[in-house]
Amino acid sequence: MLYFRYGFLVVWCAAGVSAAYGADAPAILDDKALLQVQRSVSDKWAESDWKVENDAPRVVDGDFLLAHPKMLEHSLRDALNGNQADLIASLADLYAKLPDYDAVLYGRARALLAKLAGRPAEAVARYRELHGENAADERILLDLAAAEFDDFRLKSAERHFAEAAKLDLPAPVLENVGRFRKKTEGLTGWRFSGGISPAVNRNANNAAPQYCRQNGGRQICSVSRAERAAGLNYEIEAEKLTPLADNHYLLFRSNIGGTSYYFSKKSAYDDGFGRAYLGWQYKNARQTAGILPFYQVQLSGSDGFDAKTKRVNNRRLPPYMLAHGVGVQLSHTYRPNPGWQFSVALEHYRQRYREQDRAEYNNGRQDGFYVSSAKRLGESATVFGGWQFVRFVPKRETVGGAVNNAAYRRNGVYAGWAQEWRQLGGLNSRVSASYARRNYKGIAAFSTEAQRNREWNVSLALSHDKLSYKGIVPALNYRFGRTESNVPYAKRRNSEVFVSADWRF
């Protein structure tokens, strides 16, 4: 019901621009516009013979509004401008009962209700129907373009915004159209991001802790030692989303990252990894799905794979290719609301190593299954977590008459928390931890049983908004990793502290 006192109809909505004319603008209460609405409705009251008695609140029910169709239509238009879903729903149902109601106004109400209720596909369908029947209506054109943008139909949204930009519209409306077109260009243009940071690694050569074993009645101990090295971590990513039709896109994405110890004269310990995708992606307001074939490379700081006596070049910047492979990724992400998302992905690829001995054991296929979720808590915190399963199946099931012990299955879980500390002036923190079990097949080397690993990893990152400069955001990072195993040579322990500088352009 609507309540009336002192000759003014109190409509609980913000009178302002519509979804299309003011989309993406903050919701504000325009007191001047609201006063004009109230005065306009008050004039309608003055024309009626309904008198005020004892200054009591007057209740306006559906029958009264049906008896005053102009007042009902005026209120519905104001509710549309204010994006008030409950009020629109009540007034639209009443308005449709009028014998000579405006079908276009009613259609706009149903379309906006679908949009506000989180049904963007339905909203687009309704606006497209309205636009097909009323191609000259500027308001419907803008509402349609905004709805298509919200549902990530960027190609048609850009086309309709381009049409609107040619119309004789008020300057604020044209400015808003320009903002939408700029956003669309940013989403479909080339996007680059990357980072470079100094790092100190206490175990750059990935050596196992010192251990001893019995061999023919003699004790043999390892001689390798962990080597400390200062290096540079680097990462760069490029992405291009090309609209095809409606929610369908061609996606190109590539990334490469690694560590170089060039300045420590230990380039032999360099490592890197790169992957490039090119495939189909479906994307709308609620979900994203993709089929993405990819090519990947694994990089190394040394090319002396088979020639063990070859002298190592410890002052080399470009890495060598250690292994490469091709595969495909199937992925799906669902967002039930803006603050919560679920993701699942499947991967399959085949890898090939350059080194003959390693290729004999490690050429083969790898399958992965990944499930993750992220939840926004309030305005400044996000928690996330997931489960990962990976298996490696070597091309050669047996080597030298024994089961290939490079085959494994890995189960892992991880969780994390990201927080923006506004009370500290813009400090941002991110902490994550993971645990996994990796079980190998066959008998491990120098052992009588299969290898069983347990892997722990912890990472922490701190950054501050006030320290950013032209899109470059420095962060202090700490990483710790530990692997426990039933075979001594597979044990690992490593920690790293580094300052990163990430940027997007």
Curated annotation (Swiss-Prot):
Q: Where is the signal peptide?
A: 1-19
What InterPro entries does its record include?
Answer: Slam_C_b-barrel
The annotated topology with respect to the bilayer is: Multi-pass membrane protein
Q: Where is this region: N-terminal domain?
A: 23-188
Key word Disulfide bond present: no
Where does it live in the cell?
Cell outer membrane
Mind listing the UniProt keywords for this protein, alphabetically?
A: Cell outer membrane, Membrane, Signal, Transmembrane, Transmembrane beta strand
C-terminal probable beta barrel: annotated span: 189-505
The regions listed as transmembrane in this protein's record are 190-200, 232-243, 248-258, 273-283, 287-297, 326-335, 340-350, 368-377, 381-391, 411-420, 427-437, 456-465, 472-482, 495-505
Q: Which GO terms describe its cellular component?
A: cell outer membrane
Q: What is its main location?
A: membrane
* Pfam families noted in UniProt: SlipAM, TPR_Slam
Reply yes or no: does the keyword Lipid metabolism apply: no
Domain of life assignment: Bacteria
Recorded family membership: Belongs to the Slam family.
Q: What remark about domains does the record contain? A: Consists of a soluble N-terminal domain and C-terminal probable beta-barrel in the outer membrane with 14 predicted beta-strands.
Q: What does this protein do?
A: Required for correct export to the cell surface of cell outer membrane lipoprotein HpuA heterologously in E.coli (hpuA does not exist in N.meningitidis strain MC58).
Name under which the protein is recorded: Surface lipoprotein assembly modifier 2
Species: Neisseria meningitidis serogroup B (strain ATCC BAA-335 / MC58)
